[in-house]
Amino acid sequence: MKQPFCIWQDIYVVGSAEISHPYDCCVYLVDAGELVLIDTGAGEGFNRLVGNMLTLGFAPEKLDSVIVTHAHIDHIGALSRFKREYGVKVIAHELEARAIESGDGVGAEFYGVDYQKCSVDMKLEGTEHDFHFDKYDIKTIHIPGHTQGSIAVYADIAGGRVLFGQDIHGPYEVGWGGNPGQAVVSLQKLIDLKADILCEGHFGIYQPSSEVRQYIEGYLYQLEHKIAGER
């Protein structure tokens, strides 16, 4: 396994398929004064995630919250353990809360793992939210398309805008809770944020801003042409 690393001031990768467990999404840690995790991986790599935090000098007991980008197992599998062992607040869009709390539709069967249900402390309504921490504000924006309650997370830190866009690559299939038409609108919203750094859900880090834009536009182009071809 590779080692966790710093992406930008106070932002770290603590999990991924290469860092914590092959089933895991990219798991990001923000030191905003309080520690905030973006997603948790599929659950099998929990101990590795905790160890990676310790390697970087962060005590998991200092975790304040986990922001869930969407309710697929590779992003939420370790939620219940983080909540049970460290008392984190779980933040998710209200449209994802049912899946997180019931386990329905999270896709655990595709990975052959057991999902442990988890209560959601803060169910986000509407489009945008701003969370105030000691050092930084962290913002969320509703971006339906991959799932109905998908959110992106972003923060302005040390002169750069960092976007946790997560599964920009999709899929956007209806069977996974997706909607290609909604995804087109959502991808344009992400482009309009003009991020300097993109922290993607599975494919790592993109920078500078020109590469961020190019990456998102590539998937937007594919979706638009797919939709046009189906008409």
Language model features with spans:
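Short, charged, surface-exposed secondary-structure boundary motifs
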Residues: 23-24, 100-103, 173-177
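Conserved beta-strand hairpin/beta-sheet module of binuclear metal-dependent hydrolase folds
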Residues: 2-56, 152-168
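Active-site HxH/HxHxD metal-binding segment of metal-dependent hydrolases
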Residues: 44-47, 54-129
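Short Pro/Gly-enriched beta-strand edge/turn motifs at strand-loop
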Residues: 7-16, 110-112, 134-138
